[in-house]
């Protein structure tokens, strides 16, 4: 499992892609803009392809990689506090392995921020420094770090709040995992290559209890990465301020990200990456799994007008967990769900997605694009309403590709674990839609 950034292109927001490998959602709902630390930006799920042969075997091919990204649009050199995760939040990756729109496995991540109280002798006094580092950093739990981030991982089987809970551990049995500090700059962490070497030290081999024999191993990493979602947010949200002919030409798919120079790709996110044996994720003979990520906050928050010394000590949080962010398929809450229901969608569960069906079957985006690109709501919008094709892509999966045998309509990212992985060099960035175009088909 490697975590080098590879751009994943949203080549054209006009296409609803049925690709079970990508998603995106940056600051998409009113409430989540007030809590960026729990704003889920992307969810990826795919068969691991590290070291696989051209026939899809070998290497890490028996594993599934799940990546949940949070905290969008992190500016480089965003100090002095940078982008630590929220210790008062619960970050989760959920798996439905029977097709009933309910989680049957959940991986829970909780974070702890340890202030080391680094101080310097200034005259006769020892005075705390104002930075999160006191010198160069190159190792796990480096002595020069004034703030150490760590996290725990638990696996829950069954309902996320009522199921059986077990600790995911390092291979030595320890339950605490370390997170690399965000990239501060070259003097603290060296150049890009040096930072990558430092970050790679925070990829840990893990043991997952309750998995079938020989399938209980995996890897985990949490840390800052360059945003891999390629889209020019400015032109897109400025009423798609680009020529329609350019946007609709599949030959321009690589230009959308400007070779990694699109505005969003000049920012960072915080990645939660987990690699698990596919045999641990599936149930019975069903090979299709559905995945999504959520973040939750405590129901009650008490602000302290006179906080004690410490780190993030201005609030006390308590009560039940309340889900405030949800992400599965690409761009659903960003471009499909109507503005009045965006917060509702973020708080909802897949099993209740019937309440949002009209947004999928009668989408407004094609009409908006017609207005902005051709001065007519009907100029570009398909007339095959209701859009059962979109319901298939987003809510049930595509037959023969990623549809479970007994599919309850729900918005989750689906992956058929029986389909072999493809080496990176021969992958199609547009997934199923890209393959249709490659063989001469047409997009609906």
Residues of each region from the PLM?
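Surface-exposed extracytoplasmic segments
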Residues: 22-444
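Gram-negative bacterial Sec-dependent N-terminal signal peptides
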Residues: 2-22
């Amino acid at each position: 499992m490697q975590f080098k950034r590879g751009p994943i292109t949203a080549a054209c927001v006009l296409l609803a892609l049925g690709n079970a490998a990508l998603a995106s959602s940056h600051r998409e709902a009113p409430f989540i803009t007030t809590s960026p630390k729990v704003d889920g930006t992307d969810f990826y799920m795919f068969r691991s392809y590290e070291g696989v042969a051209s026939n899809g075997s070998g290497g890490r091919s028996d594993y599934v990689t799940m990546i949940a990204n949070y905290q969008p649009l992190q500016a480089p050199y965003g100090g002095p506090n940078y982008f630590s995760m929220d210790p008062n939040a619960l970050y989760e990756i959920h798996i439905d392995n029977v097709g009933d729109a309910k989680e049957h496995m959940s991986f829970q991540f909780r974070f702890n921020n340890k202030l080391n109280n680094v101080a310097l002798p200034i005259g006769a006094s020892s005075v705390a420094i104002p930075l999160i580092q006191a010198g160069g950093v190159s190792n796990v739990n480096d002595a020069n770090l004034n703030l150490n981030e760590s996290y725990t991982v638990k696996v829950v089987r069954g309902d996320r709040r009522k199921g059986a809970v077990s600790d995911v551990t390092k291979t030595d049995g320890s339950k605490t995992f370390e997170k690399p500090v965000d990239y501060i700059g070259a003097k603290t962490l060296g150049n890009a290559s040096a930072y990558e070497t430092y970050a790679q030290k925070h990829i840990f081999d893990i043991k997952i209890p309750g998995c079938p024999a020989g399938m209980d191993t995996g890897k985990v990493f949490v840390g800052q990465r360059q945003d891999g979602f390629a889209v020019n947010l400015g032109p897109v949200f400025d009423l798609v301020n680009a020529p329609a002919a350019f946007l609709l030409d599949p030959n321009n798919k690589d230009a959308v990200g400007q070779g990694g120079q699109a505005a969003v790709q000049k920012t960072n996110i915080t990645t939660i990456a987990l690699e698990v044996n596919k045999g641990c994720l599936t149930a019975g003979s069903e090979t299709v799994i559905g995945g999504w990520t959520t973040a939750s906050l405590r129901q009650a928050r008490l602000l302290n007008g006179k906080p004690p010394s410490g780190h993030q000590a201005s609030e006390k949080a308590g009560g039940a967990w309340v889900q405030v962010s949800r992400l599965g398929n690409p761009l659903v809450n960003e471009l499909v769900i109507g503005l009045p229901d965006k917060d509702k969608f973020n708080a909802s569960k897949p099993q209740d997605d019937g309440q949002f069906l009209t947004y999928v079957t009668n989408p407004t985006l094609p009409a908006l694009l017609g207005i902005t690109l051709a001065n007519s709501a009907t100029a570009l919008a398909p007339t095959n309403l209701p859009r059962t094709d979109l319901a298939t892509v987003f809510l049930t999966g595509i037959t023969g590709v990623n549809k479970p045998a007994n599919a309850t309509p729900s918005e989750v990212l689906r992956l058929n674990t029986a389909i072999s992985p493809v080496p990176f060099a021969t992958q199609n960035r547009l997934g199923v839609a890209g393959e249709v175009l490659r063989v001469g088909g047409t997009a609906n």
